């Protein structure tokens, strides 16, 4: 019997069930413990990045090769002949999908991954980020990192700090964790960057408890996971940014009363919202989180391309 992810488009984290999320996390752990370079042998995966990327692209391409696949593609779509000749995205997808077994794509346009899935001739499309919309593989590595450090995905106290309005990673992670039981969220952000109403409405409908705070110091002792994000300078004038930035910088001193199991996560790149003295604490986990991205993407690719898993 094929797993439910076999040949499935991975466009939005909301379209994955709790059971599918658990299967990906479990498979990532198995591949971390016991690498398997034969899982997608003879499969070719397109890695098509229509906007520049470093971490996501390298992570996907490493994952593909570690489980036996081959990669074709590009990392700056604006410089390809596709763009220079004015080919539509739909036609580009039709052409590229005729060469490959799966299609990993990042695109600056919201909804581009959904569009690609409609023109890929049945080839599964994996969304590696479409504008400010979705970035499901980041959420998968976040879930795996949480499970690795906490041993569970339920009964967690999780704070999201910084830019909660525009940060697609926090939207998707909140949606994913809402599928699990008895998780409690703390939203810490300036009013101008608060979690969007539609996310809060989804959480209300799901019965998920959450609280809103303007500073993080008071919530840190309550947490299992502290998920930091960058407050983007371009959203504020200079004086307002200086004030807001200083309120959302995590230092080692902030962690003095933290639970022993607390882990600090960050989708990276960080700028100055986590000081380097945090790196030396046992709570820092953001660089291990990056490594976990390879295992999570190995698991995702293996399940999408291997019927027997």
Curated annotation (Swiss-Prot):
GO biological processes: 'de novo' pyrimidine nucleobase biosynthetic process; 'de novo' UMP biosynthetic process; amino acid metabolic process
Keyword Transferase carried by entry: yes
Underlying gene: pyrB
Gene Ontology molecular function terms on file: amino acid binding; aspartate carbamoyltransferase activity
Alphabetical list of SUPFAM superfamilies matching this protein: Aspartate/ornithine carbamoyltransferase
Lineage: Bacteria, Pseudomonadati, Pseudomonadota, Gammaproteobacteria, Vibrionales
GO cellular component: cytosol
Family membership noted in the UniProt record: Belongs to the aspartate/ornithine carbamoyltransferase superfamily. ATCase family.
Name of the protein in question: Aspartate carbamoyltransferase catalytic subunit
Pathway in which this enzyme or protein is active: Pyrimidine metabolism; UMP biosynthesis via de novo pathway; (S)-dihydroorotate from bicarbonate: step 2/3
PANTHER family per the UniProt record, alphabetical: ASPARTATE CARBAMOYLTRANSFERASE (PTHR45753:SF6), ORNITHINE CARBAMOYLTRANSFERASE, MITOCHONDRIAL (PTHR45753)
Subunit structure: Heterododecamer (2C3:3R2) of six catalytic PyrB chains organized as two trimers (C3), and six regulatory PyrI chains organized as three dimers (R2).
Catalytic activity: carbamoyl phosphate + L-aspartate = N-carbamoyl-L-aspartate + phosphate + H(+)
Family matches, as Pfam families: OTCace, OTCace_N
């Amino acid at each position: 019997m094929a797993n439910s992810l076999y040949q499935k488009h991975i466009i939005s984290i909301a379209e994955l069930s709790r059971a599918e999320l658990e299967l990906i996390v479990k498979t990532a752990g198995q591949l971390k413990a016991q690498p398997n370079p034969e899982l997608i042998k003879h499969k070719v995966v397109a890695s098509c990045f229509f906007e520049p990327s470093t971490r996501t692209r390298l992570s996907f391409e490493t994952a593909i090769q570690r489980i036996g696949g081959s990669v074709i593609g590009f990392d700056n779509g604006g410089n390809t002949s596709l763009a220079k000749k004015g080919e539509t995205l739909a036609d580009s997808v039709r052409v590229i999908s005729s060469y490959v077994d799966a299609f990993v794509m990042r695109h600056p346009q919201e909804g581009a991954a959904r569009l690609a899935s409609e023109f890929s001739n049945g080839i599964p499309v994996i969304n590696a980020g479409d504008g400010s919309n979705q970035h499901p593989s980041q959420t998968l590595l976040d879930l795996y990192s949480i499970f690795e450090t906490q041993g569970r995905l339920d009964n967690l106290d999780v704070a999201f700090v910084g830019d909660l309005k525009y940060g697609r990673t926090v939207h998707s992670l909140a949606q994913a964790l809402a599928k699990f039981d008895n998780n409690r969220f703390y939203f810490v952000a300036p009013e101008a960057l608060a979690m969007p109403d539609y996310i809060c409405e989804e959480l209300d409908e799901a019965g998920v408890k959450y609280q809103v705070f303007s500073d993080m110091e008071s919530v840190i002792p309550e947490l299992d996971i502290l998920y930091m994000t960058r407050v983007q300078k371009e959203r504020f004038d200079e004086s307002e940014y200086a004030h807001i930035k200083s309120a959302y910088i995590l230092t080692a001193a902030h962690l003095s009363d933290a639970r022993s199991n607390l882990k600090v996560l960050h989708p990276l790149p960080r700028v100055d919202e986590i000081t380097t003295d945090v790196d030396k604490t046992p709570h820092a986990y953001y660089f291990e989180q990056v490594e976990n991205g390879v295992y999570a993407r190995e698991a995702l690719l293996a399940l999408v391309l291997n019927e027997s898993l």
